[in-house]
Amino acid sequence: YVFVANETGVEMFDSGVWTWDHVDHFHFYRADARKIGAVPGSGVAEISGGLLSTAGSTGVFFPGTGDAVLLDNAALADGDIEETLRIDTGARNGLIVPLGAGALVTEASTGSRADQLRVIAADGAKGDQISCEEPAGSITTRVGVVVGCADGAVLAVENDDGGIALEKITYPAGAAAPATTFSARKGRPTVAGLGSDAGTWLLDTREQAWRWIPSETPLLEAASVDNEAGHVVTVGVDGVVRVYEATT
């Protein structure tokens, strides 16, 4: 899907191209592109997706009101817009990330700036929470859901018993600026993160560890594309595509 956010809501388009993840291989599909519709809201929304486009949910956070919305992906695939969850977070910054049948949602413990994350069940029931100052950026890996914070990242993992474990993966001492966006080949356990400094973070969600890869040129985009060699494909402000290999 393509989500076009502006000050009055989010317009949604079905690209007609999608994949289905079978862990060791992918199935690729194509259909006619079409406009699905729009969800009205206040402020340019933050969009968070999962691993699949035709199952699970997509999260939409409206900063103007603090509303956090989950959209059903199966309904979007049929050309319909169906909200499965809508809550008022009380924050004017943040996100809502699909997590199982529910979501991981930012909250403000005081004031209107988000400073923590909370597990919300499909029926809206509140679960555990964990601190997360200045939340920004999210991605779903095979291990769990990642949300960036000022001091690291929160990793939310579904347990075998259906519970959710929340862990903070802190940056090393003297670290570069925090990552505010994350990108990787779909489902990879290691993801690349970009912040304001020249270089890219690598977050290994299996080992729960960060690695910093500096670059001479500031980067516009960075994506982790494999696990074993730690390859990261980047695009610099000079328009040059570079591939980095992480080293210990």
Go through each PLM region and give its residues.
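A charged, solvent-exposed segment within the mature domains of Sec-exported extracytoplasmic proteins
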Residues: 55-110, 123
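Loop/turn residues immediately N-terminal
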Residues: 7-11, 65-69, 102, 110, ...
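Repeated scaffold domains used in trafficking and secretory/extracellular systems
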Residues: 1, 7, 30-56, 85-101, ...
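Loop/turn-rich, solvent-exposed surfaces of beta-rich toroidal or solenoidal domains
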Residues: 220-248
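Acidic, serine/threonine- and glycine-rich low-complexity intrinsically disordered segments
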Residues: 107-227
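Structural core positions within WD40/WD-like beta-propeller blades
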Residues: 3, 59-61, 103-105, 146, ...
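Acidic/His-rich segments in extracytoplasmic proteins that coordinate ligands and/or metal ions
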Residues: 5-49, 56-61, 65-76
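Short loop/turn segments immediately following beta-strands, especially the blade-tip
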Residues: 13-25, 71-78, 157-163, 205-207, ...
